[in-house]
Amino acid sequence: MQIAVTGATGFLGHYIAQNLASDGHQLRCWHRPSSNRQPLDALSHQVTWLPGDLSDASSAATLVDGCDAVVHGALWRTGSTFRKNTSDLIEFTETNLLGTLRLIEAARKAGVKRFIFISTCAVHEEILDDRPLDETHPLWPRTHYGGP
């Protein structure tokens, strides 16, 4: 399969990209100028890197063109780590939410049949002891990153 991956240079994303490539898939991955692509250098014969980010609708269309699936794990943020995000909440939400919607729409227009959106454990800053940690567990994020 040809799979578009956003966030491939991130913590989870590079593991996902490695696993998809080891299963024989061809990948089209977004990168920003500041991205560290070195952990995926060994996969260069299976990975096509394309410049792009969540704020650019045309790069979303280019990324998903010809793909069978999308794995979306990208995040726009400022600050040194995702948990110490210093960006304005409005800018953070607009860029990530609208960027994700642009990516979904680009995938729909391109006829992509599968779209996987990766969340984060940061939605569960507080975990209740009396129930399992599953999709019914209440969400209590403390940062923009874990927020809705």
Residue ranges and their predicted role:
Residues 45, 51-95, 106:
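NAD(P)H-binding glycine-rich loop region in Rossmannoid oxidoreductase-like domains
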Residues 25-35:
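Conserved glycine-rich Rossmann-like NAD(P)H-binding loop of the short-chain dehydrogenase/reductase
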Residues 2, 26-27, 113-114:
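Residues at the starts of beta-strands that form the adenosine-phosphate
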Residues 3-23:
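N-terminal Rossmann NAD(P)H-binding glycine-rich loop of SDR-like oxidoreductase domains
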Residues 72, 98-144:
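Conserved Rossmann-fold NAD(P)-dependent oxidoreductase catalytic core, especially the SDR/UDP-sugar
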Residues 36-47:
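Short, conserved SAM-binding/catalytic segment
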Residues 55, 91-102, 143, 147-148:
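Glycine-rich NAD(P)-binding loop of the Rossmann-fold in SDR/ketoreductase-type enzymes
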Residues 3-5, 70, 115:
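Conserved hydrophobic beta-strands of the Rossmann-like cofactor-binding core
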